[in-house]
Amino acid sequence: EVPEPPVAVWYIIPSGTMFRRTIRPIVNKLLPRAEVRHWYGEHSSTQQNIISFRNGSELHFVSADMRQRRLQGASIHFAINDETPEEDIFEEVQARVLDTHGRMLVVFAPIDAKTFWVRDNLYMPYLNGERPDIDVIHMPVSDPVTGESLVPWFTKTDIERMELQWPDPQVRAARMYGEFITRSGVVFASFDKKTHCVRPF
């Protein structure tokens, strides 16, 4: 269900540097310029970027490394978290969409300890049927059976390179298939009880 404009949207990124290097060039390519009234901070490396549209809607690019209190007080309709935010930042942004009955989207690969709170507080309750308000979409880069790319701009050769780059099955599961992993047992990955254990003497 899409709300009627005007709406306020936050695109939350890990840092301003990531916005300048990665996000802004993509936005520049995809933005329907005819629908834009003004892009505040478009050519600035320090000013917060806000795109104001002709229908009154606004798209704010917000850095997750801002202090939590700087996120307080706003009322927004939709929030996109690009990569996993800290839990306190997520909770603050969640409070921003309450009064509009808005929604949040979190996009990430579960590759480090920073994602454990998402697994414990959101993903596992979703799997157990305790959070009907949550939807989970796995977006693997390739078919795990055929190895064929599921991403239009990746070739089968790209997929094979990724598999070489991440030979560890757990890392591959997280990076290529979006599966939560627990990095346990990696210190002695080749440990075999039959080979490495002896009876007490």
Please provide the spans of the model-predicted regions.
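Short catalytic-loop micro-motif centered on adjacent basic/acidic residues
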Residues: 11, 78-81, 106
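SF2 helicase catalytic motif II
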Residues: 75-90
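Conserved RecA-like ASCE P-loop NTPase motor core of nucleic-acid helicases/translocases
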Residues: 7-19
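ASCE P-loop NTPase helicase motor core
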Residues: 86-167
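Walker A/P-loop NTP-binding motif
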Residues: 1-5
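Inter-Walker segment of RecA-like/P-loop motor cores
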Residues: 18-77
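ATPase catalytic-site recognition across NTP-hydrolyzing enzymes
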Residues: 146-201
